[in-house]
């Protein structure tokens, strides 16, 4: 049976009201075992300052963002199950959910699904890549019991 090992790091000034570790595990389990047998993923939940700093350093964007994905590149000849790290900004996720009229839990789930697909090599730079990735995200979110996260864009 496929297994995803979660290393959850809560690095917010206030960690109250965040999803439970079991929820993060459920969301990861809905994505990663479809693509590989055994994986280890770190999810770090941060405040805006850390998200802003990482986004500026690694993407050249001078603002915080919802989720950053850092895939782990295994050196040639080595076998490791470490897939990578997700850094999710609490305040951005909460603000986006409110602005988009989405349930907060569903938006958290979407950020984990979206980021996990990036760790697995999916991207949305080109239109055809975006369509494939969004279709997978929608399929996974529906399987988890949430609405299509892109429903507003399709209407």
Curated annotation (Swiss-Prot):
Cofactor note: Binds 1 zinc ion.
Subcellular localization(s) per the UniProt record: Cytoplasm
EC identifiers of the protein: 3.1.-.-
GO terms assigned for molecular function: metalloendopeptidase activity; nickel cation binding; RNA endonuclease activity, producing 3'-phosphomonoesters; zinc ion binding
Classification via Gene3D superfamilies: Metalloproteases ('zincins'), catalytic domain
Gene Ontology biological process terms in this record: maturation of SSU-rRNA; response to heat; ribosomal small subunit biogenesis; ribosome biogenesis; rRNA processing; transcription antitermination; translation
NCBIfam families in UniProt: rRNA maturation RNase YbeY (TIGR00043)
Entry's family note: Belongs to the endoribonuclease YbeY family.
Protein name per the record: Endoribonuclease YbeY
Protein species of origin: Escherichia coli (strain K12)
Taxonomic classification: Bacteria, Pseudomonadati, Pseudomonadota, Gammaproteobacteria, Enterobacterales
Gene behind the chain: ybeY
């Amino acid at each position: 049976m496929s297994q995803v090992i979660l290393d959850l790091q809560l690095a917010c000034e206030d960690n109250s009201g965040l999803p439970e570790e079991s929820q993060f595990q459920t969301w990861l389990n809905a994505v990663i075992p479809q693509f590989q047998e055994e994986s280890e993923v770190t999810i770090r939940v941060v405040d805006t300052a850390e998200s802003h700093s990482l986004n500026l350093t690694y993407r050249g964007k001078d603002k915080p963002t919802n989720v950053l994905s850092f895939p782990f590149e295994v050196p040639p000849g080595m076998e490791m199950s470490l897939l990578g790290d997700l850094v999710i900004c609490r305040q951005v996720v909460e603000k986006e959910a409110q602005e988009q009229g989405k349930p907060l839990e569903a938006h958290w789930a979407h950020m984990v699904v979206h980021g996990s697909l990036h760790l697995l090599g999916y991207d949305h730079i080109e239109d055809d890549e975006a369509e494939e990735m969004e279709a997978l995200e929608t399929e996974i979110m529906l399987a988890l019991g949430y609405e299509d996260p892109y429903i507003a864009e399709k209407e």
